[in-house]
Amino acid sequence: MSERNSAVLELLNEDDVSRTIARIAHQIIEKTALDSKDADRVMLLGIPSGGVPLARRLAEKIEEFSGVSVDTGAVDITLYRDDLRNKPHRALQPTSIPAGGIDNTTVILVDDVLFSGRTIRAALDALRDVGRPNYIQLAVLVDRGHRQLPIRADYVGKNLPTARAEDVSVMLTEIDGRDAVTLTREDSEGDS
């Protein structure tokens, strides 16, 4: 007979999450040349639920560091998922695109965790129905590997190699009341 126990490890605390968001904001400023007069209009679109508050925080940091205001919004991927047959009853989330739309802009999709790549593929499909940006980039707080699709992030806060059976959770103050990144491991113990 075996018994399963879970071990929860805190990988990033509140200060770590804050520093990581600041680092991603600096990378976005540098890569997009936001402070250049020739720069494309840049917007951050969060993927619900964790990507939305992350996009807002990144926009705040970008403005703090560069003086440039960046529009934020949200893109709902519910109807674009490839696993609707497995879980057909999902709550739709609002999609909010900044005024002026996404045509001829640089859109940075923001999500909390990058895993298989399927969520990002769904977000790309959703964006295609909204408009045609010049560039689409991806910013994630955590990249845990295990891609099933050829997707990679342009901006990564923390690379966390994990086992497929492990669970990475990003907690954000706006949703969970605190900032942290945890890893849950299922440990099996055999009974003799």
Curated annotation (Swiss-Prot):
Protein name stated in the entry: Bifunctional protein PyrR
Query: Could you say which residues bind substrate here?
Result: S49, G50, R90, D111, D112, V113, L114, F115, S116, G117, R118, T119, R144, V168
Asked whether the UniProt record includes Glycosyltransferase among its keywords, one would answer yes
Give the UniProt family note. Belongs to the purine/pyrimidine phosphoribosyltransferase family. PyrR subfamily.
Catalytic activity entry: UMP + diphosphate = 5-phospho-alpha-D-ribose 1-diphosphate + uracil
Broad enzyme group? transferase
Q: What is its EC number?
A: 2.4.2.9
Q: Which PANTHER family match?
A: BIFUNCTIONAL PROTEIN PYRR (PTHR11608:SF0)
Motif PRPP-binding: where in chain: 107-119
Q: Which CDD domains match?
A: PRTases_typeI
Note whether Transferase occurs among the keywords: yes
Encoding gene per record: pyrR
What is the species listed in this Swiss-Prot or TrEMBL entry?
Corynebacterium glutamicum (strain ATCC 13032 / DSM 20300 / JCM 1318 / BCRC 11384 / CCUG 27702 / LMG 3730 / NBRC 12168 / NCIMB 10025 / NRRL B-2784 / 534)
Instruction: Outline what the protein does.
Output: Regulates the transcription of the pyrimidine nucleotide (pyr) operon in response to exogenous pyrimidines. Also displays a weak uracil phosphoribosyltransferase activity which is not physiologically significant.
- Molecular function in Gene Ontology: uracil phosphoribosyltransferase activity
> What keywords would UniProt list here?
Glycosyltransferase, Transcription, Transcription regulation, Transferase
Q: Name one Pfam family in it.
A: Pribosyltran
Question: One GO BP annotation here?
Answer: regulation of DNA-templated transcription
